[in-house]
Swiss-Prot record:
It holds the Pfam family SPOUT_MTase. Disulfide bonds: none annotated. S-adenosyl-L-methionine binds at residues 76, 108, 127-132. InterPro entries: Alpha/beta_knot_MTases, RlmH-like, tRNA_m1G_MTases_N. This is Ribosomal RNA large subunit methyltransferase H. Its main location: cytoplasm. Keywords: Cytoplasm, Methyltransferase, rRNA processing, S-adenosyl-L-methionine, Transferase.
Amino acid sequence: MKVKLICVGKLKERYLKDGISEYQKRLSRFCQFEMIELTDERTPDKASFADNQLIMSKEAQRIHKKIGERDFVIALAIEGKQFPSETFSELISGVTVKGYSTITFIIGGSLGLDSIIKKRADMLMSFGLLTLPHQLMRLVLTEQIYRAFMITKGSPYHK
């Protein structure tokens, strides 16, 4: 199984890079994990609604190029479904049973995701109503993916 994490913007903070690297190493026992960082568009000060839409559209084009035709796509969006870790684990296991070999998670840029990407997604997922930095969300999601595999395995990691 392959798990892709497509992110808009470059990861800057060393502690986040280190945390993600640790979970990538742990995930290598269960799947081929790939994090794809895409260039984000600069958002001008006092950007108009039209400016924001254009920025999200450009980012969506970059995202779309990295999604495989047969990928099961989960886009992170505030309006998405929320799951406890156990249900998330079942979801990941269920995707492979349905015949998908790749699960692709998408984290948009600071403006969010364009509707085209949300429509392409097989599922919208939310980690709640809190606003978190997109870079921190990468670490949180990577840990939850690892946790999902550990739950499936029956490991005491998830207590």
